[in-house]
Regions:
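RecA-like P-loop NTPase motor core of helicase/translocase proteins
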Residues: 1-192
Length: 192
């Protein structure tokens, strides 16, 4: 029950305040963090404000493990099986770039893939390598980068205490746009 209560509070705040806010849900070991993350990701992916406008274009679930947490993936997939709703990024930055381009509602990835997204955009545009990219391929990648930065993201970070510092976190913020993820100051804390 405490997981559902925390999810409801974050969803209500997200509906009222919109993107660009920070919330912290603290869980003790074995208290249902996976449930909270999976329920929250689906609720935020379909969240609309009081004017019936979609609040977030995409929910990005980030784990700091280099190999995606299978339990977390399974929990998120169990809720929604429709094609294109959930995409686990278990290969490379090209796969992450494609998910951000095609409008996937929920993207599950590791933090380590974000520094390479721009290279993935070039590859998705048809370039074999960054050095061999044509002007047209670079222009397409730049257009996608601009489009990605304009979208509104909800970013759910598993183990946020170890994931939100350093160069990789700054690159995540740069790719998803300035308003997508703010520094973890002044955040609301709902403790479990």
């Amino acid at each position: 029950y405490h997981q559902l209560d925390a999810v409801r509070k974050v969803v209500a705040a997200g509906r009222a305040e919109g993107p660009g806010q920070n919330y912290l849900i603290q869980h003790s070991a074995g208290s249902g963090k996976t449930n909270s993350i999976s329920w929250l990701s689906h609720r935020l992916a379909s969240l609309h404000d009081a004017g019936d406008r979609k609040v977030f274009d995409c929910v990005v679930v980030i784990t700091d493990r280099r190999v995606l947490d299978q339990q977390l993936q399974d929990a998120i997939y169990q809720i929604e099986h429709a094609q294109g709703v959930v995409k686990a990024i278990d290969q490379d930055s090209k796969q992450l770039a494609a998910a951000l381009i095609d409008g996937t509602k929920i993207v599950i990835t590791t933090l380590q893939k974000f520094p390479f997204v721009l290279r993935g955009l070039l590859h998705a545009a048809g370039a074999e390598t960054q050095e061999k990219a044509t002007a047209e391929e670079r222009a397409q990648a730049k257009a996608w980068e601009s489009e990605i930065a304009k979208r509104r993201y909800a970013v759910i970070v598993d183990e946020a205490h170890s994931s939100q510092t350093g160069e990789t976190a700054r690159e995540l913020k740069a790719i998803l746009g300035a308003g997508a993820v703010e520094d973890a100051e002044g955040e609301t804390d709902w403790e479990d």
